[in-house]
Amino acid sequence: AFYRAQYPDWSKEKIQNKIENMTDEDMDDMVEPSIYDENIDHVRLVVEDIFKNWRNRSNEGKYNALFTTHVGGNKASTPMAVMYFNEFQRVNKERAEQGLFTLKTAVTFSQSTNNGDYQKVTNDGLWSAMQVYNEQFGTAFGLDDTSAYTQDVASRLNRTAIDGNFLDIVIVVDQLLTGFDAPQMNTLYVDRTLKNALLIQAY
C-alpha cells in the first residue's frame, strides 16, 4: 500500500521486487512519522530525565554520553536533533541561574547540500549550534569547515582534546555511531529505531 501510494506508476512486479529487496533506509522511509517526532513535550521530558539521572548514570561526571535521534516517514531528522540541542541549552540556562550543574552539550550532523525541503533549516540549525560551541570552547568553526568541527566535537567526547575541556553529551543523527572509540563514554541515549548492523555496532 505504501509503495502504491508513493509510486502510482510502478507495476505490481516492480513494487514486489522493491519489497523483497528492502534496505534499512527503505524501511525507515516507510515508517509513519511518530507522535513523538518534533514533539516539544516529548523532548522536554527526555531532557528532564537525562538531567534527573545524570549524576548516577555518569558516575558523578566521570563518564559522558552520546544521544542519537531519527524520525521516520522519509522526513529530515536534523530538526529533531536541533530541537534536543536547544532544549538542553534552555535547561542549562535555567539551571545555571539556580546554581545547579549544567551539561556541556554539542550536536553534529552533516551539512545539507541537496537543495531539498529541509536544507535551510538543517544548515541554520547546524550554524546556530556551532556558534554556541564556539563561544563555549573558544573555537571559530563555520559551515565551511563542518568536518573540522565534527573532529573537534569527537575529541571532546572521547576526551583527547588538548585543552582538557570536554563534552558531557553529544547529539547525533548517524555520525559517531560506528567506528568511534570513546573509553569514557558509558551511555547511549536512543530516541529512534536502530536495526541490524547499526544496532550492534552502535552498542
Q: What are the residue ranges of the model-derived segments?
A:
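Short glycine-/polar-rich loops that comprise or flank the Walker A/P-loop
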Residues: 62-63, 100-104, 183-187, 197
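Generic amphipathic alpha-helical segments used as scaffolds and interaction surfaces in large
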Residues: 30-41, 72-75, 140, 144
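Short helix-terminating capping/connector loops at secondary-structure junctions
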Residues: 59-62, 96-103, 164-166
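Helical mechanochemical/support elements of P-loop NTPase systems and associated helical scaffolds
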Residues: 42-46, 80, 149, 195-198
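Conserved RecA-like ASCE P-loop NTPase motor core of nucleic-acid helicases/translocases
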Residues: 63-72
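Conserved helicase motor "Helicase C" RecA-like lobe of SF1/SF2 P-loop NTPases
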Residues: 73-129, 173
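Conserved RecA-like P-loop NTPase helicase motor core
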Residues: 110-203
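Interdomain helical connector at the RecA1-RecA2 junction of SF1/SF2 helicase-like NTPases
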Residues: 1-64, 82-85, 90-96
